[in-house]
Regions:
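Short, charged, surface-exposed secondary-structure boundary motifs
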Residues: 150-160
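Flexible loop residues that form catalytic
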Residues: 124
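A short helix-to-beta-strand connector/capping loop
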Residues: 66, 141-143
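A polyanion-binding, active-site-adjacent surface
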Residues: 1-118, 127-131, 156-157, 164-176
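Short helix-capping segments at alpha-helix termini
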Residues: 135-141
Length: 179
């Protein structure tokens, strides 16, 4: 979040228009730092860069940013008991506010993504939300990389998880690339 604030202040100092500032903020803050490095490594490991005909998935955060849409099932920063909300406590379905964002607001945004896109739900909580939305018929016809490990440094098992899921992930990416 610090990166987002810094980019916003920089844009204001440059007297940029608000639309440009917000685009630059999203670009700078989307999976910044170690989480971005881990994500790029895993995307490259799965061949996403080859499927979109670029040298590395890192270009999705730079010169090929128009190919990437990042979002969240809960669109705004959430803090619980003074700490960043991890998606676990409280469980989304135990909070009317979180439930509204995950199951009502998010599907509206998600339905606007042009099909067929490659969708990468990051983490078990997101996969559980997607599973429920799918059962309710609220997920568009996209290609979903279920089982893709969360790239957070806190996920010390991500390399093992990627290895275990790699065959399935490669198959989905290949199907999406050959559409």
């Amino acid at each position: 979040m610090k990166m987002a604030f810094q980019q916003f202040v920089k844009g204001l100092a440059n007297l940029d228009n608000i639309e440009k500032i917000l685009q630059d903020v999203k670009k700078a803050a989307s999976f910044s730092g170690t989480i971005r490095s881990n994500l790029i490594h895993m995307l490259d490991e799965c061949g996403v860069h080859e499927a979109i005909h670029v040298k590395s998935s890192s270009s999705l955060f730079e010169e090929h940013r128009q190919l990437l849409h990042t979002t969240s099932i809960i669109k705004y920063p959430v803090f619980y008991q003074g700490k960043n909300y991890t998606g676990h406590h409280p469980i989304i379905s135990h909070s009317s506010l979180l439930t509204t964002y995950a199951y009502h607001i998010f599907p509206q945004e998600f339905s606007q993504i042009e099909q067929p896109a490659l969708i990468i739900p990051l983490g078990k909580t997101v996969e559980h939300v997607f599973d429920k939305l799918n059962r309710e018929g609220k997920l568009p016809e996209h290609f979903y990389l279920y089982g893709f490990p969360h790239p957070s440094g806190a996920n010390g098992h991500r390399k093992k998880q990627l290895l275990l899921q790699k065959e399935s992930l490669l198959s989905t990416i290949s199907a999406w690339a050959g559409r």
